[in-house]
């Protein structure tokens, strides 16, 4: 049965208009984005199938075009739509951070970092540069690559902070393997960086480790120098 044949109150679009987007399931939201299904499958059926195959909405939305294209009804058009949705979400979160980012609101920072780094397939490190009021000046990528390739030079971070006239910064990196626990190398690097930043009167406020499901804060773990 096609969605057009469903009772009006159960159709995703009509349900959204009547109850709001929060009332829809992941499959219903995805069905609105997909618009159509395939032969024998409504858009909602296709959405449910894809969510089951990929394991989560985040993994599906971050899938590469080649992997998406292996599924009937999916391809470059769907990949483009998903990429646009991800980027819009990232920019909205970045706008919120630029308006006000404070340590009293760590959830906003964690949400942004999870969205920005959580689905990366390789290790990526970023710096969030802040002014005296703890408002976001800029987000800069520090490195990208495998763990073996992902070398971050402290002097480059110091230079970046000075070039951007930052009063403080937050650094973050993802663990593609899924474990959010800081390694001994992470802890030692954070100590060395905090010491180097103090020499130029820039505060290292926190270091976050990000996975697709979890964000860990060094400050909350009691690991900040």
UniProtKB/Swiss-Prot annotation:
<dbReference type="InterPro" id="IPR046778">
    <property type="entry name" value="UPF0758_N"/>
</dbReference>
<dbReference type="InterPro" id="IPR037518">
    <property type="entry name" value="MPN"/>
</dbReference>
<keyword id="KW-0645">Protease</keyword>
<keyword id="KW-0862">Zinc</keyword>
<dbReference type="GO" id="GO:0046872">
    <property type="term" value="F:metal ion binding"/>
</dbReference>
<dbReference type="Pfam" id="PF04002">
    <property type="entry name" value="RadC"/>
</dbReference>
<keyword id="KW-0378">Hydrolase</keyword>
<dbReference type="GO" id="GO:0006508">
    <property type="term" value="P:proteolysis"/>
</dbReference>
<keyword id="KW-0482">Metalloprotease</keyword>
<dbReference type="Pfam" id="PF20582">
    <property type="entry name" value="UPF0758_N"/>
</dbReference>
<protein>
    <recommendedName>
        <fullName>UPF0758 protein NGO_0681</fullName>
    </recommendedName>
</protein>
<feature type="domain" description="MPN">
    <location>
        <begin position="102"/>
        <end position="224"/>
    </location>
</feature>
<feature type="binding site">
    <location>
        <position position="175"/>
    </location>
    <ligand>
        <name>Zn(2+)</name>
    </ligand>
</feature>
<keyword id="KW-0479">Metal-binding</keyword>
<dbReference type="GO" id="GO:0008237">
    <property type="term" value="F:metallopeptidase activity"/>
</dbReference>
<feature type="binding site">
    <location>
        <position position="186"/>
    </location>
    <ligand>
        <name>Zn(2+)</name>
    </ligand>
</feature>
<feature type="binding site">
    <location>
        <position position="173"/>
    </location>
    <ligand>
        <name>Zn(2+)</name>
    </ligand>
</feature>
<feature type="short sequence motif" description="JAMM motif">
    <location>
        <begin position="173"/>
        <end position="186"/>
    </location>
</feature>
<dbReference type="InterPro" id="IPR025657">
    <property type="entry name" value="RadC_JAB"/>
</dbReference>
<comment type="similarity">
    <text>Belongs to the UPF0758 family.</text>
</comment>
<dbReference type="InterPro" id="IPR010994">
    <property type="entry name" value="RuvA_2-like"/>
</dbReference>
<dbReference type="InterPro" id="IPR001405">
    <property type="entry name" value="UPF0758"/>
</dbReference>
């Amino acid at each position: 049965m096609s969605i057009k044949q469903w009772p009006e109150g159960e159709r995703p679009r009509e349900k959204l208009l009547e109850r709001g987007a929060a009332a829809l399931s992941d499959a219903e939201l995805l069905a609105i984005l997909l618009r159509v299904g395939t032969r024998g499958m409504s858009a909602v059926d296709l959405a449910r199938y894809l969510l089951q195959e990929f394991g989560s909405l985040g993994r599906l939305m971050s899938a590469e075009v080649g992997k998406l294209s292996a599924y009937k009804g999916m391809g470059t058009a769907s990949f483009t739509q998903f990429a646009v949705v991800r980027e819009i979400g990232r920019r909205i979160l970045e706008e919120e951070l630029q308006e006000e980012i404070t340590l009293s609101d760590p959830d906003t920072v964690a949400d942004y970092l999870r969205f920005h780094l959580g689905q990366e397939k390789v290790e990526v490190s970023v710096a969030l540069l802040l002014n005296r009021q703890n408002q976001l000046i800029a987000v800069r990528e520090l490195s990208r690559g495998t763990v073996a390739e992902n070398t971050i030079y402290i002097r480059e971070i110091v230079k970046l902070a000075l070039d951007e006239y930052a009063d403080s910064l937050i650094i973050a990196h993802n663990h593609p393997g899924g474990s959010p626990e800081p390694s001994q190398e992470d802890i030692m690097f954070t100590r060395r960086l905090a010491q180097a930043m103090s020499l130029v009167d820039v505060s290292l406020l926190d270091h976050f480790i990000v996975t697709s499901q979890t964000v860990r804060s060094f400050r909350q773990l009691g690991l900040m120098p």
